[in-house]
Amino acid sequence: MGATGLRSYALKSYGVKMSPEEARLYRRRFFKTYPGLKSWHDNERRTWQRGGTETRTVTGRRRMDIQKLTDRLNAPVQGTAADGLKLARALLWERRGECPGAVPVLVCHDEVVVECSAEQAADAKARLEKAMIEGIDTVLNGADEGHVPVEVEARVAISWGEGG
């Protein structure tokens, strides 16, 4: 995201107004703090400028016919997160006997909804968190746990529509 996009995103999402120079400054500071990300962005930009139209997730899943730079930058990140979520869902299914009344009923973007009785809620929440962490950790770190820390948030609610 360039400085113009950052300004627009900050205003629309958070009501934060910033000048073009402030947006450029925040962007420079961000990349100075995360030089590896800056290097990756620069490399992806060069590849895109040379006509590179394919990206891959950490697991190797391909996205073809990339036309826009933002898609080239977003696809590997979002796709890798999706790969981790898919593995987490598989782990939930494999372990369904551990909490038989807890049933995954919905996946939307990065959210998983599990239905269960009130008595099982704490156990179902813990099992969901464990599966999510293990799935994403396996995708990001493989057999070597601990390189990229993984955190997830889960909550117990009466309905998915509850704020939180």
Question: Language-model segments: which ranges?
Answer:
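Conserved catalytic core of nucleotide polymerization and phosphodiester-bond processing enzymes
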Residues: 1-164
